[in-house]
């Protein structure tokens, strides 16, 4: 099996990626970065792939007749609600989009990667998979869950040349961050980070682009935090 992976790498590495949530923010930066490296990137929109509807995921996979070497599970939702008042609908919808839909995509694409002897999976997690915050119980639980799913992928598909990891960003300057915070609030967030600023989406994307490349030949089953030192304090 190792010979198959080396042969694929020497041929130029991965050639096609599927990136969810690629319309903006980290997902768009990842997709753009991969395309700049000559990789064909599939960027399904919600009309094509609605992660909140299991049947939509199944239909998308059925219609996908292209080889996918790279899967970046970036799309997710976060609807803050305190534990005591957390609704069943909020909990269920968060787990569906952030966990179950990703599991379905993995179940559909991993056998194809295994058959090719090469695959790279990265799920975008969060520092809140590792640190609790008021109102984030559904979101934090979903991110912790997807990290465990990815570790299982690493164990079960490692023998077939598939490496799977999570990247857990801290505060990132995405469109949503700007929409939800004024200048004073952004400064307050930056002061909580040892490096004194929030990350740019491109800083997350450049690491993911390396992690899914053939240059990464051994890192798997990990959750790598990119937070400017936030979790250290």
What are the residue ranges of the model-derived segments?
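N-terminal Rossmann NAD(P)H-binding glycine-rich loop of SDR-like oxidoreductase domains
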Residues: 23, 31
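Substrate-binding pocket helix/loop in short-chain dehydrogenase/reductase
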Residues: 82-83, 90-95, 177, 189
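Active-site helix of classical SDR
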Residues: 106, 142, 150
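Alpha-helical segment proximal to the catalytic Tyr-Lys
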Residues: 111, 155-156, 217
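C-terminal substrate-recognition "lid" of short-chain dehydrogenase/reductases
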Residues: 118, 197-226, 231
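Residue(s) in the substrate-gating loop at a strand-loop-helix junction
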Residues: 126
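Short, small/polar-rich loop/turn modules that mediate ligand/substrate recognition or access, typified
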Residues: 158, 163, 219-221
